[in-house]
């Protein structure tokens, strides 16, 4: 793992311990298992693609470690409604507090304000967080291959699916992709950002996509900032996108989405 990931994971372990002290695992599990009716995250993406449209997972992100605060006027419900109005397929909400200034409440507010399925964007390393994700209303969780070994990924995926949540597994290189393809989830996210240098290259997606079987749903993540970037991806038959920073700096995030994707 990169230095930044090691630092983040160390903080996550402390956060999980604190959370368990506040609400023990049996109570969190009971609450998670009593929740009903997730929204169909994979289905929402596939429906857009079937209609010949880009399937956009629009991100709600206040800040990042590399860029600082992206949006001072940050009202998750308003952002979610704007995204929904202008054609997003799904939402992604950052819930990591220390590094991204996110919040569980932001996910709850975003999901309550519209009908789109919602991804919890965080660093999931423990079963407790999976139950917690379901309790807060997440329809999908992110598993980052760089943070987890094969056994952990398999266990966390199985738990999420048992709770009727989808799983987006994120990879950064060929070795991680090979590991991710052992999982059941159709959702394979290729992050174009190098987590060691924070440099972004869309070539990462183009280089790895040929190794992703056709029955999987490839999502390109990070670095999509211009209509030319979108065209380059769509010409290569990449039709699902996770985009955040490009929208967060805009006055009206949904309008920025429509302009970027030509909707």
Curated annotation (Swiss-Prot):
InterPro entries: Aldolase_TIM, Indole-3-glycerol_P_synth, Indole-3-glycerol_P_synth_dom, Indole-3-GlycerolPSynthase_CS, RibuloseP-bd_barrel
A Gene Ontology biological process term: L-tryptophan biosynthetic process
Pathway it works in: Amino-acid biosynthesis; L-tryptophan biosynthesis; L-tryptophan from chorismate: step 4/5
Keyword set includes Transmembrane: no
Pfam families, per database record: IGPS
EC number assigned by the record: 4.1.1.48
Catalytic reaction annotation: 1-(2-carboxyphenylamino)-1-deoxy-D-ribulose 5-phosphate + H(+) = (1S,2R)-1-C-(indol-3-yl)glycerol 3-phosphate + CO2 + H2O
Alphabetically ordered keywords of this record: Amino-acid biosynthesis, Aromatic amino acid biosynthesis, Decarboxylase, Lyase, Tryptophan biosynthesis
Molecular function per GO: indole-3-glycerol-phosphate synthase activity; phosphoribosylanthranilate isomerase activity
Domain of life: Bacteria
CDD domains, per database record: IGPS
PROSITE patterns, A to Z: IGPS
HAMAP family noted in UniProt: IGPS_B
Protein family per UniProt: Belongs to the TrpC family.
Name of the protein this chain belongs to: Indole-3-glycerol phosphate synthase
């Amino acid at each position: 793992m990169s230095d930044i990931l090691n630092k983040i994971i160390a903080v996550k372990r402390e956060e999980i311990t604190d959370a368990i002290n506040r609400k023990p695992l049996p109570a969190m599990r009971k609450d998670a298992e009593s929740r009903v009716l997730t929204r169909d995250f994979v289905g929402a993406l596939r429906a857009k693609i079937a209609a010949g449209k880009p399937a956009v997972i629009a991100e709600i992100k206040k800040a990042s470690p590399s860029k600082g605060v992206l949006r001072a006027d940050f009202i998750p419900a308003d952002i979610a409604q704007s995204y929904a109005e202008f054609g997003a397929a799904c939402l992604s909400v950052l819930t990591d507090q220390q590094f991204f200034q996110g919040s569980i409440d932001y996910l709850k507010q975003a999901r309550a304000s519209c009908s789109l399925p919602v991804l919890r964007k965080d660093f999931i390393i423990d079963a407790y967080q999976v139950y917690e994700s379901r309790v807060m209303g997440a329809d999908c969780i992110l598993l980052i291959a760089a943070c987890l070994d094969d056994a952990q990924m398999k266990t966390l995926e199985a738990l999420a699916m048992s709770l009727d949540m989808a799983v987006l597994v994120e990879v950064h290189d060929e070795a991680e992709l090979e590991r991710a393809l052992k999982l059941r989830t159709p959702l394979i996210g290729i992050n174009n950002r190098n987590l060691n240098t924070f440099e972004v290259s869309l070539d990462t997606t183009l280089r790895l996509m040929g190794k992703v079987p056709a029955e999987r749903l490839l999502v390109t993540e990070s670095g999509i900032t211009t209509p030319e970037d979108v065209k380059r991806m769509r010409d290569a038959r990449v039709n699902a996108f996770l985009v955040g920073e490009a929208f967060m700096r805009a006055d009206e995030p949904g309008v920025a989405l429509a302009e970027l994707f030509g909707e």
